[in-house]
A protein has these predicted regions:
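Short alpha-helical
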Residues: 14-15, 36-37, 47, 228-229, ...
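Short helix-initiation/N-cap motifs at beta->coil->alpha
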Residues: 13-16, 58, 202-204
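Periplasmic-binding protein-like
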Residues: 28-32
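Short hydrophobic/charged patches on amphipathic alpha-helices used for structural packing
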Residues: 17-18, 208
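ALDH superfamily catalytic-core signature
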Residues: 22, 34-181, 244, 291-292, ...
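Residues at or immediately flanking beta-strands
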Residues: 5-7, 51-53, 94, 153, ...
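PLP-dependent aminotransferase-like
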Residues: 1-17
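Conserved C-terminal structural/oligomerization subdomain of aldehyde/semialdehyde dehydrogenase
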Residues: 26, 63, 117, 128-129, ...
Length: 300
């Protein structure tokens, strides 16, 4: 790669980021981060009318159908929310479970969650590591307290983790809330931490309505044995990526990006080339006969 093609500029976002976004010689900006910062970047980019690609926050819904395979679904559901300590934009943070299996799903999720080993990230036996900083830890604990205050049932976790090897780091117990309603703060705002909200539904229409009742639309999912039914429901969820019976699956040939306040544009797939290129139309006339130029008759 020739010198200058790739440049790494480090520094605080408020300084380096602002300089890049507002500079006239920068014609395209791609950003991955919070919706709040994404909105600011979009507003700044308007000053020079530059293209932006924004991959922002999420509050991913996962609809659990009554016919799920518990043995495979339960651990995969937990991977969807607790991977990377929940610090993943597409994390499955809203689990929408049919009322007929709600209690058993919550019970099995809690039992499996209590087996997750917290520890240092470089330890191969670690199941979940710490969150990124003290401020993020305190923010997550604040959301957990708001869930308790609003009446959600704390099933497991909910505290800063302690124990051997956990004192040097910002560890939070993997947390599950049951009896969550979609108007609660923990169900509406991106927590970016190891917190799962379990909601209940009666009908398919209600499940889809809950899933789509969000400012976000980055990802979503459906769990169930009937793949045809799951695919049908997937088409009705307003999100850029939908997983069926799995989570966090990416391919370089499959586009990734969000609906609504989860972003603009797509990364990966053929679509990404349009995000980083401009379309040009070059029209060349090969005739020397004015008679073959009908527009001339409008002027002469």
């Amino acid at each position: 790669i020739p010198p200058g093609v790739i440049n790494v500029v480090t520094g605080p976002g408020a300084e380096v980021g602002d300089a890049l976004v507002t500079h006239r010689d920068v014609s395209k900006v791609a950003f991955t981060g919070s919706t709040e910062v994404g909105k600011k970047i979009m507003a700044q980019a308007a000053g020079t009318v530059k293209k932006v690609t924004l991959e922002l926050g999420g509050k991913a819904p996962a609809i659990v159908l009554p016919d799920i395979d518990f043995e495979t679904a339960i651990p995969s559901i937990l991977l969807g929310v607790f991977f990377h300590s929940g610090q993943v934009c597409e994390a499955s943070t809203r689990l929408i479970v049919h009322e007929s299996i709600y209690d058993i799903v919550v019970q099995q999720l809690a039992e499996a969650t209590k087996k997750i080993k917290l520890g240092q990230p470089l330890d191969i036996t670690t199941g979940m590591g710490p969150v990124i900083s003290e401020s993020q830890m305190n923010k997550i604990l604040g959301y957990i307290q708001s869930g308790i205050d609003e009446g959600a049932r704390l099933v497991c976790g909910g505290k800063r983790a302690s124990g051997p090897g956990l004192d040097n780091g910002y560890f939070i117990e993997p947390t599950i809330f049951a009896d969550v309603t979609n108007d609660m703060k923990i169900a509406r705002e991106e927590i970016f931490g190891p917190v799962l909200c379990v909601l209940k539904y009666s009908t398919e229409e209600e499940a889809i309505a809950i899933a789509n009742d969000s400012d976000y639309g980055l990802s979503g999912g459906v769990w169930g044995r009937d793949v045809t039914k799951a695919n049908e429901i997937a088409t009705k969820i307003n999100a850029g990526t939908i997983w069926i019976n799995d989570w966090h699956i990416f391919r370089t040939d499959a586009p990734f990006g969000g609906y609504k306040q989860s972003g603009l544009g797509r990364e990966q797939g053929a679509q990404v080339f349009y995000e980083y290129t401009e379309v040009k139309n070059i029209c060349t006339s090969l005739t020397t006969e004015n008679a073959q130029r009908p527009a001339l008759g409008l002027l002469f």
